């Protein structure tokens, strides 16, 4: 399957595509065996996040993709990975240029800042200070390997 994805990416790159947005890319490695997700009291469904996100081979897979498809075109391709549930520490690993995985990530932690006791369908007023603290935390956590200015550069990615 990975080889087929690399072939598809190469096909698009040969036609002039400059980059890829990779949705839920942190879900491509799973913890096996897959089991039923634990279901909280009153929940309609279980939460499988621990079994499907940031799996044991995720960094291996992303590095392999980078080396086989992207590295042969230095400076010509940009990658951004959508990573629901990723922590800032995980995002720093995914975007560290020395690791050769992704250029940027985007996440949704700040979106949940208005979740009330009933979750996202029970929104509460947004506290501007909390939002600023959240975004500043992400910028500081990713700053060692990236440009926290909001500008995308060829050498470093912007993450938030």
Task: Give the ranges of each region predicted by the language model.
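Active-site-proximal loop/turn and secondary-structure-junction residues that shape catalytic pockets
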Residues: 24-28, 83-85
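Short, acidic/polar
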Residues: 1-13, 135
């Amino acid at each position: 399957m990975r080889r087929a994805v690399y072939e598809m990416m190469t096909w698009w790159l040969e036609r002039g595509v400059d980059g890829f947005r990779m949705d839920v890319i942190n879900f491509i490695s799973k913890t096996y065996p897959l089991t039923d997700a634990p279901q909280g009291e009153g929940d309609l469904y279980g939460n499988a996040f621990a079994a499907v996100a940031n799996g044991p081979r995720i960094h291996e897979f992303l590095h392999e993709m980078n080396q086989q498809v992207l590295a042969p075109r230095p400076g010509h391709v940009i990658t951004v990975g959508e990573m629901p549930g990723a922590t800032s520490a995980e995002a720093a690993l995914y975007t560290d240029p020395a690791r050769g995985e992704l250029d940027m990530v985007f996440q949704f932690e700040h979106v949940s800042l208005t979740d009330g006791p009933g979750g996202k369908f029970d929104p509460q007023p947004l506290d501007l200070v909390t939002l600023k603290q959240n975004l500043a935390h992400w910028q500081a956590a990713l700053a060692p390997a990236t440009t926290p200015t909001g500008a995308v550069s060829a050498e470093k990615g912007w993450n938030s």
